[in-house]
């Protein structure tokens, strides 16, 4: 039997994803950068359902407007029913990469027409897992990207990057090559070009696939803990003068992993953002190793203030403090 073409592999992945996750949907959007991954996905998506291509111009590189307009024209030629260039302003909070990602997702959310297809591949998933491991980011980060996290859809998480590049060649598409992808100043670039090839060589191949399988297995475990934590939260919640508080005695009775997940959910509901494993464990110690210590500052979108989790009279409280 002839080997399935790259385009056919991508089409099969997109069709399978749609059957599992998007049964009631009849149109979708795709995030298009002009690079080979998103260009190949756009080509396949436009053949399946009415597709709107959304091209985000971050304005961070010389010629970005030309790159975006070229991608828009390609999307229309591939059969997209609409293609729009979305110009965004990238702030400085959390570093340029994080700020660009935040601006990009906000623009896609605002302008999307149905669910949004993102062209993350198995290789991207492997890099995400390695980043999480290296930074000690906790199980949720190591579990990688979710295939379906409405409205975000990642139908290519089981497909190697080499397949999207091959699909572009089969279709005669000229993809934009992002210079950041070869810039060694970026951690992901070095993971992609140095670390993963070395691991493949030392361990005899199959490392990217193994990392992706690890992410899937761990995500299943974290989903279960999330469910248990959601069921446990009402039993630990206490109505306070400044919103929901948590009873430390009720938290103490929970298994460690469940307790920390309850704390995480409580922090997020209270306005925390960008939580790290270190912060969550710091708040957890207010329950399990209470010695009268001060509170734990966590990230938030507050201006001129910071969000601090502390303990008072046997309950965890969230308070705002001036910076």
Curated annotation (Swiss-Prot):
Signal peptide per UniProt: none
Catalytic reactions on record: cytidine(34) in tRNA(Ile2) + L-lysine + ATP = lysidine(34) in tRNA(Ile2) + AMP + diphosphate + H(+)
Annotated compartments: Cytoplasm
Pfam families recorded: ATP_bind_3 (PF01171), TilS (PF09179)
EC number: 6.3.4.19
Entry keywords, A to Z: ATP-binding, Cytoplasm, Ligase, Nucleotide-binding, tRNA processing
GO cellular component terms attached to this protein's record: cytoplasm
Domain of life: Bacteria
A molecular-function term among this protein's GO annotations: ATP binding
UniProt binding sites for ATP: 33-38
Keyword Zinc-finger appears in the UniProt entry: no
Keyword Cell inner membrane: no
Alphabetical GO biological process terms: tRNA modification
CDD domains for this protein: TilS_N
Function: Ligates lysine onto the cytidine present at position 34 of the AUA codon-specific tRNA(Ile) that contains the anticodon CAU, in an ATP-dependent manner. Cytidine is converted to lysidine, thus changing the amino acid specificity of the tRNA from methionine to isoleucine.
Domain comment, as recorded: The N-terminal region contains the highly conserved SGGXDS motif, predicted to be a P-loop motif involved in ATP binding.
PANTHER family: TRNA(ILE)-LYSIDINE SYNTHASE-RELATED (PTHR43033:SF1)
UniProt similarity note: Belongs to the tRNA(Ile)-lysidine synthase family.
Name used for this protein in its record: tRNA(Ile)-lysidine synthase
Gene: tilS
